[in-house]
């Protein structure tokens, strides 16, 4: 599914109340300053997409090729460039320098949010994969928190790829699907999304219309 989305910054979590008095946990996303830097078409690039910039960056921190690319679009340099695949009809409605705001979505709409999870450092299998620990006593002397067997003997004589073992936990790209937009603050350019979103405060996230919801926009 090809849909235009937004780049945002995770502000943090809070709660809001409905008209019925129900408390809803929400994650606040700052989606300000999404500006179009390039419109890609089938004729020039082989596919249709829109490239947007988010945030700000000092001119001294921008490479000359990128500075020329942004100057051509008449857009200020940003922290990040993100490309969204869209259809030709939607691309025709946009132009370089156009601002894509929070009004791209509507309250109640389902969205997918992608971010980088918080890094936890080196972790064992109990913390990393929720393995069970061994017995504390009754003959168990040195195998309380070990993962157990990681393979067989001479045949096949190796550890299979993908075996869950100790290692770095977190700091991976995670996509949470079908989150609901609880509220939109168009004036402050904020999206309030129901539930938790991967990543630390200040982390960059990508918000797109849900792809697995019936009738998703």
Swiss-Prot record:
InterPro entries: Ribosomal_uL3 (IPR000597), Ribosomal_uL3_bac/org-type (IPR019927), Ribosomal_uL3_CS (IPR019926), Transl_B-barrel_sf (IPR009000). Residues 134-154 are annotated as: Disordered. GO terms for cellular component: cytosolic large ribosomal subunit. The modification N5-methylglutamine is found at residue 154. One of its GO terms (biological process) is translation. Keywords: Methylation, Ribonucleoprotein, Ribosomal protein, RNA-binding, rRNA-binding. GO terms for molecular function: rRNA binding; structural constituent of ribosome. Methylated by PrmB. Residues 134-146 have a biased composition (Polar residues). Pfam families: Ribosomal_L3. Part of the 50S ribosomal subunit. Forms a cluster with proteins L14 and L19. PANTHER family: 50S RIBOSOMAL PROTEIN L3 (PTHR11229), LARGE RIBOSOMAL SUBUNIT PROTEIN UL3C (PTHR11229:SF16). Belongs to the universal ribosomal protein uL3 family. One of the primary rRNA binding proteins, it binds directly near the 3'-end of the 23S rRNA, where it nucleates assembly of the 50S subunit. This is Large ribosomal subunit protein uL3.
């Amino acid at each position: 599914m090809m849909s235009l989305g937004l780049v945002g910054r995770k502000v943090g979590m809070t709660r809001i109340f409905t008209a019925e008095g129900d408390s809803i946990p929400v994650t606040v996303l700052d989606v300000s300053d999404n500006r179009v830097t390039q419109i890609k078409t089938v004729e020039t690039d082989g596919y249709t997409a829109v490239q947007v910039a988010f945030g700000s960056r000092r001119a001294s921190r921008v490479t000359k090729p990128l500075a020329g690319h942004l100057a051509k679009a008449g857009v200020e340099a940003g922290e990040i460039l993100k490309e969204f695949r869209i259809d030709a009809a939607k691309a025709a409605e946009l132009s370089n320098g156009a601002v894509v705001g929070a009004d791209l979505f509507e309250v109640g709409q389902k969205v997918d949010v992608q971010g980088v999870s918080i890094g936890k450092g080196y972790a064992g299998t109990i913390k990393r994969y929720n393995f069970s620990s061994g017995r504390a006593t009754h003959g168990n002397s040195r195998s309380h928190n070990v993962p157990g067997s990681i393979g067989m003997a001479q045949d096949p004589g190796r550890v299979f790829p993908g075996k869950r073992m100790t290692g770095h936990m977190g700091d991976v790209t995670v996509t949470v699907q079908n989150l609901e937009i609880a509220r939109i603050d168009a004036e402050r350019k904020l999206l309030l999304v129901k539930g938790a979103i991967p990543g630390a405060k200040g982390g960059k996230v990508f918000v797109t219309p849900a792809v697995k919801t019936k009738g998703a926009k």
